[in-house]
């Protein structure tokens, strides 16, 4: 892997960590005190007659385990870093490619067997009727402008070949699990961390809530994660996957800054120049086309109070994913310490994690979009990848 930014790694690592930990701490406030942000930011809080309905300092359900486990893990991590204890023997273990493929096949088989029963029940999301109208009544041949061609084409294929629009989205969710394995494997150069990353995504309640949904399909996430993997493996194809992500969900376009950081932090030489110029050109072309088509500013607004609502909703939307809620902060610290030892990819993962935490509040602040939990699935993926990198021994990190 590239170490092209190592010369500036201490400054970069501190800057990335400051950005990342600030967002995580802000979002973690509602884990400990669920009503605090709302009571402070209420539009009536300045009135003398205002009385909060609940105690703003009432502890949340996960407050105690959050504080205790975070304290323990951070203490262990700092002692490990300061004392230079070696866990190399523990993380030297890996499995052969054959065993890894067998393990993946078993995991996916269990997942498929446990999920296939969902197809006996109709999808109940409110927007499902709108998706049906586009696919069945309107037809993909009548799509115009910046419509989601990729998403609706894949849904149409699913309906025509399988008789159910949810089959191909389910296959995309399986492909997302496999892609998560490969990107973690590519970063760590080991298979065990890849398997762990895949399992961490699979145990997520948010992932399992939308894995068979045609309304909120995972096409956009799959193509975006694949575009990052291709930067590391087959960079010439990365742009194609990113464009497919945009035409699966236009929200993917605002991931470009994170992609640019990933490129600069993980490539060098001609590859870096080519990817930087091409992604930069893609960004400029996208902004120009979007502004002329009135799709970028069509629902633009400014509702500053929504930013705090978006921050506050973070713990609520992840309430059934306690592993992510509790371990995000120590993961950020561990990735920071790992980056100080020369593992520059830790900075990329921190930027991706914090970026996907920040996008939902910003989206509902500057547009009329609603805050939906499915937008946190990329966070789940990169949380899993981040954890997997800690469990893999990276030779370049060792003193």
Residue ranges and their predicted role:
Residues 1-114, 349-350:
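Start-transfer (signal-anchor) and selected internal transmembrane alpha helices
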Residues 180-203, 221-222:
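Transmembrane-helix signature of polytopic, membrane-embedded enzymes
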Residues 113-133, 139-155:
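Extracytoplasmic catalytic/substrate-binding loops of multi-pass membrane glycan-assembly enzymes
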């Amino acid at each position: 892997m590239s170490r092209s930014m190592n010369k500036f790694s201490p400054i970069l690592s501190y800057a990335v960590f400051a950005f990342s930990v600030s967002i995580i701490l802000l979002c973690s406030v509602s884990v400990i005190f669920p009503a605090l942000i709302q009571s402070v930011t209420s539009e009536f809080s300045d009135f003398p007659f205002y009385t909060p309905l609940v105690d703003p300092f009432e502890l949340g359900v996960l407050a105690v385990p959050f504080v205790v486990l975070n304290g323990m893990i951070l203490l262990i991590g700092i002692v490990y870093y300061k004392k230079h204890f070696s866990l190399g023997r523990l993380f030297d273990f890996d499995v052969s490619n054959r065993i890894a493929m067998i393990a993946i096949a078993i995991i996916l088989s269990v997942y498929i067997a446990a999920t296939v029963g969902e197809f006996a029940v109709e999808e109940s999301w409110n927007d499902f009727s709108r998706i049906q109208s586009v696919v069945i009544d309107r037809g993909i041949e009548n799509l115009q402008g910046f419509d989601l061609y990729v998403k609706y084409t894949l849904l149409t294929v699913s309906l025509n070949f399988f008789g159910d629009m949810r089959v191909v989205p389910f296959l995309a969710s399986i492909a997302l699990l496999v892609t998560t394995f490969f990107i973690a494997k590519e970063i760590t150069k080991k298979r065990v961390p890849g398997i762990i990353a895949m399992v961490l995504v699979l145990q997520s309640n948010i992932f399992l809530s939308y894995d068979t949904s045609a309304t909120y399909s995972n096409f956009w996430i799959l193509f975006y994660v694949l575009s990052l993997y291709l930067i590391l493996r087959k960079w010439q194809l990365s742009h194609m996957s990113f464009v497919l992500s945009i035409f699966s969900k236009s929200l993917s376009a605002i991931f470009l800054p994170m992609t640019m950081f990933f490129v600069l932090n993980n490539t060098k030489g001609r590859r870096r120049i080519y990817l930087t110029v091409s992604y930069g050109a893609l960004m400029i072309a996208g902004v120009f086309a979007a502004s002329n088509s009135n799709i970028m500013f069509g629902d633009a607004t400014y509702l500053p109070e929504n930013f705090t609502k978006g921050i506050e909703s973070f713990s609520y939307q992840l309430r059934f994913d306690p592993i992510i809620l509790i371990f995000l902060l120590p993961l950020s610290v561990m990735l920071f310490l790992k980056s100080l030892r020369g593992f520059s990819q830790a900075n990329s993962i921190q930027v991706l994690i914090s970026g996907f935490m920040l996008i939902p509040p910003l989206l509902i602040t500057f547009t009329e979009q609603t805050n939906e939990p499915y937008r946190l699935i990329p966070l789940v993926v990169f949380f899993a990848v981040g954890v997997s990198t800690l469990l893999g021994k990276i030779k370049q990190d060792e003193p």
